[in-house]
């Protein structure tokens, strides 16, 4: 083509595409222009109510509102049939009723296993139940009972009511009853009385009894028992014994003789009030399996005959659902207070009064909505609600306790953006890419890329950059290693700064709960900032990675055109060729530049980006690392979608 005149020469280039509608994205080793951009993650909003992390590893404990055997089910229920099947429930029951067994009340054997335990019960022992038995108001005992249940349940996989403890009682006592207990008494503790004969023995004999907490109850292993240590409280010695006998005492000892519970008015003062009727107090004891003794002053013996047994094998979430009556019945809020004062317990509360569908007390629509999440699996459960989206960020701080892969609080504008839509690489600047410098295209070369990114928990991994021929451009092994070294160093700097900040915060810890909550919030904010910083570094490396990969693909594309042209076209600059219009007509040019039009012009897809966080971002900044794999997929015959610019 040396003899061609200027009129016979035609210059064909890839058309310039970049204009003011493109945005520039800077990265490590290369930059990109893009028609669109999007945030690496969107903010998620938690859904109010309860959910679970795994449908196969949770269990519920309930009453008529979760009881499938109730004659009004499902209208009587606050959960779906699917969820009700996960509950151990009986209408009229509650864990506390089964623990104490007041006369005339439902006595249900609560037992079951699950990593996550959901409690929706308690209303059946409330002021409306009007249970007396030497105590007009049981709310404080209920509060301590529920709190102990939640605490031990959070540390156990299995729990069970033990409704019959082995015991040995003294011969001089017999089962007693009380007028203020429906002329009966509780099943636990059992009341034993001693008849005193004034002529023979004015004061009676001291009572000595024994009970055994088993290591196993049926198929349930027992590492720890919840035992109610009950005793009477007298205002004065005279109220207890008008005959002038000794002081009142009811004390529990372990096998070594150590006092583990009870009251001893021989060393502790009476209340000093003016009442003439005792009240009963019950303390919640956490005791190991073994043989225990009970010593009491004459006349009365309160004997532990039941317990709740826990295997203490697995820590897990606990959810307590507010259990209150509808209109016309008095409720207490012991469940609420117990959960809020127990670490690891998430409380589900209503915002409106209970309004039932089946009756005033069964089938509340608001509660159904709050518990509908139990039908699904969530990535995160917290006091603020549950989340099943994959984003690591939420607009507002999620209140603890929280479990799973919980998002961190962040502002939308702080989340890094990645290029989207049509992508155009700029000239590379990475000094580790040594060849082919002369082959790297400029900003006006158009290409389409599909990106898939997966972030997994395994340490920083390698990049998949597509094919790279020895004669082509792109990133070298040394370049990739240096890129990873840089991102690794930068992330370590971020994490080091975060750890320093946490150490400073540790110095400010006080023993009050608010200070600890404030500290937790500040630590989480530091982790959020560190994660955002890490994502910024990842974004920059990904942009550079895409840019270099696209540059390589463009070089390979130009090489293919040059090879097809042979002597019919001369490459005068990257992406531009001179041809003889007389020798190579339109069909010839179609063969060279449009591959004989055998490939259809593709519909230009947007950048397809997916980022999945497999580790818990709440703990990022510790020993967990990040691994990134990125793959670029290009259309096989991209040239068919590229416009041609002709000049003479």
UniProtKB/Swiss-Prot annotation:
SUPFAM superfamilies per the UniProt record, alphabetical: Influenza hemagglutinin (stalk) (SSF58064), SGNH hydrolase (SSF52266), Viral protein domain (SSF49818)
Source taxon at top rank: Viruses
Region of interest: Fusion domain-1: 8-33
HAMAP family: INFV_HEMA (MF_04072)
Chain residue ranges for the region called Esterase domain-1: 34-151
Subcellular location: Virion membrane; Host cell membrane
Catalyzed chemical reaction(s): N-acetyl-9-O-acetylneuraminate + H2O = N-acetylneuraminate + acetate + H(+); N-acetyl-4-O-acetylneuraminate + H2O = N-acetylneuraminate + acetate + H(+)
Statement: the UniProt record of this protein carries the keyword Disulfide bond: yes
Region forming the signal peptide: 1-7
An annotated Gene Ontology molecular function: sialate 9-O-acetylesterase activity
Positions of region (N-acetyl-9-O-acetylneuraminic acid binding): 151-303
Name of the featured protein: Hemagglutinin-esterase-fusion glycoprotein
Protein EC: 3.1.1.53
Job description of the protein: Binds to the N-acetyl-9-O-acetylneuraminic acid residues on the cell surface, bringing about the attachment of the virus particle to the cell. Plays a major role in the determination of host range restriction and virulence. Class I viral fusion protein. Responsible for penetration of the virus into the cell cytoplasm by mediating the fusion of the membrane of the endocytosed virus particle with the endosomal membrane. Low pH in endosomes induce an irreversible conformational change in HEF2, releasing the fusion hydrophobic peptide. Several trimers are required to form a competent fusion pore.
């Amino acid at each position: 083509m040396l003899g061609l005149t200027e009129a016979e020469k035609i210059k064909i280039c890839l058309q310039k595409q970049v204009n003011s509608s493109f945005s520039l994205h800077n990265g490590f080793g290369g930059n990109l222009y893009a028609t669109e951009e999007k945030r690496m993650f969107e903010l998620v909003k938690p859904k109010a109510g309860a959910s679970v992390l795994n449908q196969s590893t949770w269990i519920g404990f309930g009453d008529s509102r979760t009881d499938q055997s109730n004659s009004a089910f499902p209208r009587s229920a606050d959960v779906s049939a699917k969820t009700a099947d996960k509950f151990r429930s009986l209408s009229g029951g509650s864990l506390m009723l089964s623990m104490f067994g007041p006369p005339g009340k439902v006595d249900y054997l609560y037992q079951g296993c699950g990593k996550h335990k959901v409690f929706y019960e308690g209303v059946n022992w409330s002021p409306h139940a009007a249970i007396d038995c030497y105590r007009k108001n049981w709310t404080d005992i209920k509060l301590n009972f529920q709190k102990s249940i939640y605490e031990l349940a959070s540390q156990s996989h299995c729990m069970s009511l033990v409704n019959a403890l082995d015991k040995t009682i003294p011969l001089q006592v017999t089962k007693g009853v009380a007028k203020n207990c429906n002329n009966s008494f509780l099943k636990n503790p059992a009341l034993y009385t001693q008849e005193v004969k004034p002529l023979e023995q004015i004061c009676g004999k001291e009572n000595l009894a024994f009970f055994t907490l088993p290591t196993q109850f049926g198929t349930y292993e027992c590492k720890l028992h919840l035992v109610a240590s009950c005793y009477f409280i007298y205002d004065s010695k005279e109220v207890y014994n008008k005959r002038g006998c000794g002081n009142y005492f009811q004390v529990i000892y372990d096998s070594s003789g150590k006092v583990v519970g009870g009251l001893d008015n021989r060393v502790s003062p009476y209340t000093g009030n003016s009442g003439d009727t005792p009240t009963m107090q019950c303390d919640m004891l956490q005791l190991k399996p073994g043989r225990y003794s009970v010593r009491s002053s004459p006349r009365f013996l309160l004997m532990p005959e039941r317990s709740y047994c826990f295997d203490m094998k697995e820590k897990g979430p606990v959810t307590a659902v507010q259990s209150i009556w509808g209109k016309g019945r008095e409720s207490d809020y012991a469940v609420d207070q117990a959960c809020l004062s127990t670490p690891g317990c998430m409380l589900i509360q209503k915002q409106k009064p209970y309004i039932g569908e089946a009756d005033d007390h069964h089938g509340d629509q608001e509660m159904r909505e709050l518990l509908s999440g139990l039908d699904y699996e969530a990535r995160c459960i917290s006091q603020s609600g549950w989340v099943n989206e994959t984003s690591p960020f939420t607009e507002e701080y999620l209140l603890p306790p929280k479990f799973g892969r919980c998002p961190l609080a962040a502002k939308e504008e702080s989340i890094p953006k990645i290029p989207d839509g049509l992508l155009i690489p700029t000239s590379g600047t990475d000094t580790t890419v040594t060849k082919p410098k002369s082959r790297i295209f400029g900003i006006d070369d158009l290409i389409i890329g599909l990106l898939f990114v997966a972030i997994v928990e395994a340490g920083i991994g390698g990049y998949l950059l597509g094919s790279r021929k020895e004669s082509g451009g792109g990133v070298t092994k040394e370049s990739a290693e240096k890129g990873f070294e840089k991102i690794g160093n930068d992330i370590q700097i971020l994490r080091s700064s975060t750890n320093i900040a946490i150490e400073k915060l540790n110095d400010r810890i006080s023993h009050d709960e608010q200070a600890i909550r404030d500290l937790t919030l500040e630590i989480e904010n530091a982790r959020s900032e560190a994660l955002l910083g890490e994502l910024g570094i990842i974004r920059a490396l990904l942009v550079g990675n895409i840019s270099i990969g696209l540059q390589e693909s463009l070089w390979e594309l130009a090489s293919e055109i040059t090879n097809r042209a042979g002597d019919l076209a001369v490459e005068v600059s990257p992406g531009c060729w001179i041809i003889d219009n007389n020798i190579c007509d339109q069909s010839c040019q179609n063969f060279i530049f449009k591959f004989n039009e055998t490939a259809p012009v593709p519909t230009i897809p947007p950048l397809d980006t997916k980022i999945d966080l497999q580790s818990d971002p709440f703990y990022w900044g510790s020993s967990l690392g990040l691994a990134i794999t990125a793959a670029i997929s290009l259309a096989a015959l991209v040239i068919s979608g590229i416009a041609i610019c002709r000049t003479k």
